[in-house]
Amino acid sequence: MASYSFQFSTDATGKPGAAKPYREGNRDFVVPVASISGNSELLTNAVLKATEVYTQYGQDRLGQVLISKVKGHAYSDREGTLFIEESNDMNSWTTISSLVVKANTLGETEWIHLTKRYFRFRYANGNLQQSEFLLYQSLGAGEEDININHTVPITAVAPFSVQLDKSGLTNDGRLKVQTEGLNLSSLDTQSKTMDIVFHDKTETIGEGNPFTVGSFKTLLIEVYGTAETSELKFWGKSLSGTKRALRGQKVDDGTFATSTKGKSEAWSFSITGFKEIVMELTALTNGNFSVRGTAVS
């Protein structure tokens, strides 16, 4: 099998890692046991205490470039376990790969294809405190999604024909479809994403434009503006029409809250079960404020 020299990056302070088997200057190199592609990114080199766990904040693979697969690389002088997990809402996580990393050995997962929106790496240290620890990720893009990667041919023993009369067509030639027993609205057949403007450079407090949830499950909003001070409260309306506090997760640091006084932030929400979402601006001074979002079904 061919060997490939694979160069790992340093962290933000320029500190090199301890990836084995050899070091050259201020860089670390390894020779993988298989041909791998792409660049690596150092996630952490901070050592863990006994039984301590490192958890990466969830990453969104549906950006400008679709991340289709990930690979983990870990090194430690103590044994531990590396997990790759994925989620659709950043709240409930499913393990899709795990690897026992032996002491003083560089451990690598296989390329793991992703099927959900968010992914993260998690490392659980063993019963001994580390003196050396490295965790890298490699990302792969440009492949077909695994859910549509395989096709099934349609075959027939003999050709078949379909006959339509004018009663089954609309005036512009479209096929009529009858749905007996179903109550379908436009919200049930819309695209997978929708952009929403809750507030657009508003200079007054209020609830702004509400969003009807329909079949959407998650919501990502951005808040920004020139206001000196502001407060935005997150609400979800239930079937009864009652406004209930909606807990959001701040994208930058993963903290949870039902309101914010920030002016340049992004928040994500799970909106399943609510009928309507309201972003109420309860305080605003000296400037304007905007709240825009994208809902995903």
Curated annotation (Swiss-Prot):
Residues 1-12 have a biased composition (Polar residues). Residues 1-21 are annotated as: Disordered. It comes from the Bacteria. To B.subtilis XkdY/XepA. This is Uncharacterized protein YqxG. The lineage of its organism: Bacteria, Bacillati, Bacillota, Bacilli, Bacillales. The gene is yqxG.
